[in-house]
């Protein structure tokens, strides 16, 4: 049994570490931006999500999403659910900055967002970071 315990513990730990391997799923070498319209903000676990629509030069709409911090991390940084829902209101025009999916999907891991009125939300922020 002593031989199997380290193997069992390793098998449990590896999937947890893999889940948090942002660099595995996203190209962290290149920050991209996408300008669009907020469809929905989801205050959810394990990560909050921002859904927004982006039009290309031909007027075709592409549905994007941005993976954000977990609600518990946002709360620790001083953000509330109502603040986030108020900032990311459906219909608001937004420019989202993030690191795109290596698979080429219209998905980014979130870095920051800027609304047309100039207000900005940064993922590493705290109180006062919605400016």
Task: Provide a role label for each language-model segment.
Residues 62-74:
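Short, basic/aromatic beta-hairpin or loop at an interaction surface
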Residues 44-55:
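Short aromatic-glycine-enriched beta-strand elements
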Residues 1-4:
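Positively charged n-region of N-terminal signal peptides that target proteins for export
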Residues 99-126:
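OB-fold/S1-family single-stranded nucleic acid-binding modules
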Residues 13-15:
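N-terminal signal peptide c-region/cleavage motif recognized by signal peptidases
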Residues 36-38:
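Conserved hydrophobic positions within beta-strands
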Residues 17-32:
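Short boundary/loop segments of OB/S1/cold-shock single-stranded nucleic-acid-binding domains
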């Amino acid at each position: 049994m002593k031989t199997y315990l380290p193997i069992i513990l390793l098998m449990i730990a590896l999937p947890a570490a893999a889940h948090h391997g942002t660099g595995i799923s996203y190209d962290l070498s290149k920050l991209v931006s996408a300008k669009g319209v907020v469809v929905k903000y989801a205050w959810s676990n394990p990560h909050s999500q921002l859904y927004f629509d982006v039009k290309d030069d031909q007027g075709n709409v592409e549905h994007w999403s941005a993976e954000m911090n977990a609600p518990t991390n946002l709360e620790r940084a001083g953000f509330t659910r109502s603040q986030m829902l108020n900032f990311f209101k459906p219909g608001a025009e937004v420019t989202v900055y993030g690191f795109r999916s290596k698979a080429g999907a219209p998905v980014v891991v979130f870095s920051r967002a800027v609304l047309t009125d100039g207000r900005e939300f940064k993922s590493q922020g705290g109180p006062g970071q919605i400016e």
